[in-house]
Amino acid sequence: LMDLFLTQNYQITFLSTATISENSFDLNSKNIQFQNIVLNDNSFDDLIKKLSPEIVIFDRFSTEEQFGWRVSEQVPNAVKILDTEDLHFLRNAREKAFKQNKNLENSDLVNDVFKREIASILRCDLSLIISEFEMNMLKNQFKIDEKILFYLPIFAEIKKSEIPFSERRNFISIGNFLHEP
């Protein structure tokens, strides 16, 4: 997503409550500025006003909950975009149904995460949706105005392997298995 904005000659400032570590992506390599921010702190108001962005992208609905109102107050003309990646309320409902060994039902979708995420979508000027299923569900089932939704499937470059699938060996996955299905 950042590459998309860079190709359009946007100057990007990446704001995060997380600190940069040796494992962080090198934003400087792409000429992207980094600023550390603090939750529930007026210093964010001063920073966002100083930066005066035309566009603000929230990487998930909980980020919009924390900072969206401050953006609206300090830079009211900024376009607020929610990058949903995937809908957390849907993921949450699927996880619960899976753990209960049952099929997902419409009633499973309406939960606290649903209310928060839909509210965030409605507060933003635009929400990026990566799944056609999610796009249709938001438009048809939950009657979210199509004008505030933008279907943007994952656009990572896929490199073809020179080794046929049947001949591939020795795959290792490293992680902590904390991300639910």
Which residues fall in each region the model found?
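Helix N-cap/beta->alpha junction signal
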Residues: 60, 84-86, 131-133
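A short, active-site helix/loop in glycosyltransferases that binds the activated sugar's phosphate group
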Residues: 66-67, 114-146
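N-terminal strand-loop element at the rim of the active site
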Residues: 7-39
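Short N-terminal targeting/anchoring amphipathic segment
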Residues: 48-66, 81
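A short helix->loop->beta-strand "cap" motif at the edges of active sites that frequently abuts
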Residues: 75-80, 146-147
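Acceptor-binding helix/loop patch of EC 2.4 sugar-transfer enzymes
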Residues: 82-111, 166
